[in-house]
Swiss-Prot record:
<keyword id="KW-0548">Nucleotidyltransferase</keyword>
<dbReference type="InterPro" id="IPR014729">
    <property type="entry name" value="Rossmann-like_a/b/a_fold"/>
</dbReference>
<dbReference type="InterPro" id="IPR004821">
    <property type="entry name" value="Cyt_trans-like"/>
</dbReference>
<dbReference type="GO" id="GO:0005737">
    <property type="term" value="C:cytoplasm"/>
</dbReference>
<feature type="binding site">
    <location>
        <begin position="122"/>
        <end position="128"/>
    </location>
    <ligand>
        <name>ATP</name>
    </ligand>
</feature>
<comment type="subunit">
    <text>Homohexamer.</text>
</comment>
<comment type="similarity">
    <text>Belongs to the bacterial CoaD family.</text>
</comment>
<feature type="binding site">
    <location>
        <position position="40"/>
    </location>
    <ligand>
        <name>substrate</name>
    </ligand>
</feature>
<keyword id="KW-0963">Cytoplasm</keyword>
<dbReference type="GO" id="GO:0005524">
    <property type="term" value="F:ATP binding"/>
</dbReference>
<dbReference type="GO" id="GO:0004595">
    <property type="term" value="F:pantetheine-phosphate adenylyltransferase activity"/>
</dbReference>
<keyword id="KW-0173">Coenzyme A biosynthesis</keyword>
<keyword id="KW-0808">Transferase</keyword>
<feature type="site" description="Transition state stabilizer">
    <location>
        <position position="16"/>
    </location>
</feature>
<feature type="binding site">
    <location>
        <position position="86"/>
    </location>
    <ligand>
        <name>substrate</name>
    </ligand>
</feature>
<feature type="binding site">
    <location>
        <begin position="8"/>
        <end position="9"/>
    </location>
    <ligand>
        <name>ATP</name>
    </ligand>
</feature>
<keyword id="KW-0067">ATP-binding</keyword>
Amino acid sequence: MIAIYPGSFDPITLGHIDIIERGCNLFEKVIVAVLRNQSKTSLFTIEQRLNQICHSTKHLLNVEVASFDGLAVNYAKMQQAKVLIRGLRVLSDFEKELQMAHTNKTLSPEIETVFLATSNEYSFLSSSVVKEIAVFGGSVDHLVPQHIAIDIYKCYDKTQPKPILNQR
């Protein structure tokens, strides 16, 4: 069975990668689908995000990376996928994602949404959090793959922050 994991992934985080890896254990193929959203200002171009995701998932044999326009359920039908994967961090994610799952079901009754609870260590993590930390000069090395951390530091014209040592 084919599953689609749609999102903006701007940037992809270790939390996203955790969901992808776990999805790969459940489905024959997982397509990580980057939404082309012209109305949203992005840190990285679509091409950069596709390359970042490909590099971050190269260890997974049953992952494809692509971009799409429009509705995720329409893209899923085009790819003959039966499932949309969504990660859940907190209760507010569930409310939003459940509403979207119900909406998608009215549009395409044959497509199911599968929710994967985020691993505890990533329950606070989002692309927005990563960008906010980086813009204020904090280290994001523990939140994204190393090659993406470097890309982020370049975007904000900053060098990689030095670790803060606990001094007593």
